Amino acid sequence: MAGLALAGSQRESESLLNFVVRRFVRDDGDLDGSGCTWFDQFRIYPHAWLLMAAILRARFDLVHRWSEFLQGFQDPENGGFYGTLQQRELRGEQEFMTTGVAAIALLWAGRTEAAVRTGHWMRRLLESQPDIRRQLFFVWDRQQGLVTSFPEDRATEYAVNCAATAQWYFQYGIGAALTAGLFGCTGDRSWLSLGRRFLDATKFCRDDVYRQAASGKIGWGAAWMYRVTRDSADRAIAEAVYTKLRTSQHSGGGWRADTIYSRDPGPHESGQMDLTSEFAALQSWMEDSLSLRA
């Protein structure tokens, strides 16, 4: 829905938003989870994108409901978000993607204090890294701190291994996108320094870091950083990701990535609705920033 609105399809965005509310949204603002194969793992992630869509469509009734819902999953002390009902009850794991995108959506909604708390959570997570040149651990346990031990078959869900390809590179971009937004709201340049550290860390990854479907959010973060820094290095990263994003779009207009989100990707030539909606939004934000002169 946000992707449709940013692409200029306002009526279609409004119609789809209305359909989602009628079909999937419960009275408390939660989704029923039907039709989403990754819902149990990233429980509140879709609410963040719905909140951004509601803001774009000036649906303030929905903005309030989803803002309140998301803030109910934020730890009031450390600023991270519990991605599932179970983790909130346990006061357990807070993973980077859900935490970052939820904070960005709340920043859009004017809930700056909540977003700033998440910014401090990100700084703490980054400063706790044993060696960011080798790995980016991106899950924080509320009781034990940075999670560095996990089952080998789930390693991709806990850390970016800089020596391997096809990692969840989007973590770096989410960090840069949020911190660029925090600088815009607060004028505090320390947020730009933090965003720079996230983007600089991508240089330790393999050469596919800007060419995977999981790289899309790196382009987003670099684009929002470039918008406020006019740094040629930020622009170069955004351009690299944007170019790959354009060339990987299927002839029918959609995108797909079998290693992200989908547990049942379907026919190879088809696009994935969730990924396509996100990539349309990311592409729009990159285009806007890349149109600016240095």
Q: Whereabouts are the PLM-identified features?
A:
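Glycan-recognition and catalytic cores of secretory/periplasmic carbohydrate-active enzymes
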Residues: 1-294
